[in-house]
Amino acid sequence: MAVARKIRTLLTVNILVFVGIVLFSVYCRLQGRSQELVRPLSGGCRPRPATPAPGSPLRSGGPRAVVAGRAELVLKGQLPAEPCSPGRLMVPEAEAEAQGGLAATLRDDGQEAEGKYEEYGYNAQLSDRISLDRSIPDYRPRKCRHMSYAQDLPQVSVVFIFVNEALSVILRSVHSVVNHTPSQLLKEVILVDDNSDNVELKFNLDQYVNKRYPGLVKIVRNSRREGLIRARLQGWKAATAPVVGFFDAHVEFNTGWAEPALSRIREDRRRIVLPAIDNIKYSTFEVQQYANAAHGYNWGLWCMYIIPPQDWLDRGDESAPIRTPAMIGCSFVVDREYFGDIGLLDPGMEVYGGENVELGMRVWQCGGSMEVLPCSRVAHIERTRKPYNNDIDYYAKRNALRAAEVWMDDFKSHVYMAWNIPMTNPGVDFGDVSERLALRQRLKCRSFKWYLENVYPEMRIYNNTLTYGEVRNSKASGYCLDQGAEDGDRAILYPCHGMSSQLVRYSADGLLQLGPLGSTAFLPDSKCLVDDGRGRTPTLRKCEDVARPTQRLWDFTQSGPIVSRATGRCLEVEMSKDANFGLRLVVQRCSGQKWMIRNWIKHARH
């Protein structure tokens, strides 16, 4: 009996010892991981570095002269972690390669790196090995480097929005803005966490910024995922400086970015300033210069870079501000009070997409202006994967319709056309816009026609469109007229899917055009369906390239034939074993086939 008790006691002791070892190991791993980011810098912590002298390496974009301290070196993998932690591979060459914005690589770029690519949309493992204080090239026009600014510029609150971002990328954004903004101008840095799932972005981030930048960096945490638009509104509410800069949390700032932006806003508080954007390559973190550009959009309200306006090109001064109709959205700087006066961002929009275009329309139509500033530059990672990817097309469509209904007057039909959806019962609930309409009335804003004529004259106008959408034939109702290959010249029949390749427009002039709207003078327009009379196959050509204009003209009524004005032949469908889906488009003697188009605009726009 006594022997049995001794055996049970020994077993219990052994089990407790084993459990203790496991728990201690876990504790050490967690503690080591935490200490990688929160250990104080050698020599003690300071709230922030002093403003560099004009000739210092930091001021000119060179590397910091001060050794970073153990915490940063552990983060970069240049020193082992604490003895009981998992440790990291030492790869000092990654930091050396990345200095000056050059491309960097890792020799151990294996399965772990691939997993991080998938998670973040960029090479997060490489980012962990690159200095938080690395230098990047000064891509400002030469004239910018010799400009001087007033001493009493307003202070700025810099707001970063993130959700499930790599910690080292967030910290590099913070280090970069602190390093490249004069201390008297930077009031605070506000990090808005849009309800990240990543545990590393909670305790580790808090401890790091509280120790490294006490009192300078604030963290705002959303209790639920709000999306980029409403997360920015939270940042605006938390900001206390007279000017607020909104940025993605995967950027690096160039030397002298703040002074020109703040100077332009000081001159006119109704001016929204967009730093010029350069690119950080997602795979190697190489910083690549982008050409100076304005920010435009197509009729679907997707933003894009466009050529600067002709008057800017004629001026011949690369440092001059560039008038821009809208903004890409990853960075903008605005007077805090003015931003509130004009209605912030539309809180009824979801996630992101369209809010950047809507803001451009609103600012211009309501008496303000928007410009890209080549002397103020920010490098930005264009990620291959974004955290809000689920259903982003739906949200972008919904947001576009909200903007169209409030700001675009009769031109809102162009947005419905671009998305290939009906104007009545579009299948998208864009919510109540009454408050935004009241805002427009209260601000006494101009018409969208004024905006197109004075701010975005490059937009193509489709006011003479009578009808648009999917076109089906009575002989094959499940198939739609389709532009076929983008670079081809043959229209086809294809199972109906409602995408832009099946957008057909019939104009008051008699043009039948297939494919996505060309939207601006910078993009090719949709092609015309042509019957040249030389064969039975209709072709697609650029409308302006058709030799005889009547060859591109058709007569069409709902549930009736489509008849060529040049030949009197009808566009019809014939069965053919050699054709895709056994259906071929032909022009031939009319046999009574009928065509139906989905959406009608009741009268031509003038």
Swiss-Prot record:
Q: Where is this region: Catalytic subdomain B?
A: 321-383
> Per the entry's comment, what about the domains?
There are two conserved domains in the glycosyltransferase region: the N-terminal domain (domain A, also called GT1 motif), which is probably involved in manganese coordination and substrate binding and the C-terminal domain (domain B, also called Gal/GalNAc-T motif), which is probably involved in catalytic reaction and UDP-Gal binding.
Q: Which residues make up the binding site for Mn(2+)?
A: 248, 250, 380
Q: Where is this region: Catalytic subdomain A?
A: 153-264
Ricin B-type lectin domain: which residues? 467-603
Got a GO cellular component term for this one?
Golgi membrane
Which protein, by its recorded name, is this? Polypeptide N-acetylgalactosaminyltransferase 9
The protein's organism comes out as Macaca fascicularis
Q: From the UniProt entry, list the residue stretches annotated as the region Disordered.
A: 43-62
Q: What ranges does the Lumenal topological domain annotation cover?
A: 30-606
Q: Which residues cross the membrane?
A: 7-29
